[in-house]
């Protein structure tokens, strides 16, 4: 777990505020809590978070430090979409099915 003011988060926030589109930021804030919720339910969540740190956070910070903003943005955006497909989509489908069941039972 990160300290809220750690170096990596500070760099990533600067990058977000200066380079990430408003639409991508809004999308991230919609899906990120669902992704985290789903990962936290996984038996090997620590391994998943280590992977995210090593392959997304650390990579993006390194690219930002080197001024490779396009590479950082590409990795960030693709990673969010992959994590959404892997973790958020099943949660959202499950919620939708439960809603439909409630409506048909009433």
Predicted segments, located by residue:
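Long, compositionally biased charged/polar accessory segments in the mid-to-C-terminal portions
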Residues: 1-106
């Amino acid at each position: 777990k990160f300290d809220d003011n750690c170096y990596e988060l500070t760099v990533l926030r600067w990058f977000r505020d200066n380079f990430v589109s408003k639409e991508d930021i809004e999308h991230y804030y919609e899906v990120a809590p669902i992704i985290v919720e789903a990962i936290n339910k996984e038996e090997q969540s620590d391994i998943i978070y280590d992977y995210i740190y090593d392959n997304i956070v650390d990579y993006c910070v390194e690219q930002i430090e080197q001024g490779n903003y396009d590479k950082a943005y590409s990795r960030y955006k693709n990673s969010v979409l992959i994590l959404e497909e892997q973790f958020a989509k099943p949660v959202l489908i499950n919620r939708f099915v439960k809603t439909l069941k409630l409506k048909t039972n009433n």
